[in-house]
């Protein structure tokens, strides 16, 4: 759940940054309405129960509602939609509007079966893409924490040049307090 919170909190901070861009023709105070966060989880039996609790605390999931069979037909996925103003920090503290959290439109897709990452990407593009019709899509793995302005800069690359078909951000290892994580050769590399 810490990895999920790190990623989600980073995304929510990025949405707040977009809303602070008050001189922008695209973003500004109502910029959150132009962003939809889609979480696709691979397998109802596989998802970490603590991560599911964090998602429930943010208002995106209700425990006990999901069934694996409805009307004698197997269920493929469970979809929850909600607009929240709550974030859970990587240190598991709940923050809301009083800390600058903007509303965030969320879709949580909990797939019934574990069918791996590529299938999750297909779910996003094939199931949600035609409905949302996004101009830009940013895919993040759980544990990746975008910097506070990262999503804006990725979006800007597409906005400036309509010929751009893909972009990749810089990945930086978290060094930890006083750089202690650098003692781990995998992090230091």
Curated annotation (Swiss-Prot):
Question: How does the protein associate with the membrane?
Answer: Multi-pass membrane protein
Where in or outside the cell is it found? Cell membrane
Name one cellular component (GO) term: cell septum
* Entries under InterPro entries matching the protein: Chitin_synth, Chitin_synth_fun
Reaction catalysis annotation: [(1->4)-N-acetyl-beta-D-glucosaminyl](n) + UDP-N-acetyl-alpha-D-glucosamine = [(1->4)-N-acetyl-beta-D-glucosaminyl](n+1) + UDP + H(+)
Q: Give the residues annotated as coiled coil.
A: none
Under Enzyme Commission nomenclature, its number is 2.4.1.16
Q: What is a single molecular function from GO for this protein?
A: chitin synthase activity
A single GO BP term for this record reads:
chitin biosynthetic process
Q: Major place of localization?
A: membrane
Whether Lyase counts among this entry's keywords is no
Q: Which UniProt keywords apply?
A: Cell membrane, Cell wall biogenesis/degradation, Glycosyltransferase, Membrane, Transferase, Transmembrane
The record's family statement is: Belongs to the chitin synthase family.
Entry function: Polymerizes chitin, a structural polymer of the cell wall and septum, by transferring the sugar moiety of UDP-GlcNAc to the non-reducing end of the growing chitin polymer.
Which PANTHER family does the UniProt record give?
A: CHITIN SYNTHASE, CHITIN SYNTHASE 1
Q: What is this protein's record name?
A: Chitin synthase 1
Say which species the protein is native to.
Schizophyllum commune
What gene name is given for the protein in this entry? CHS1
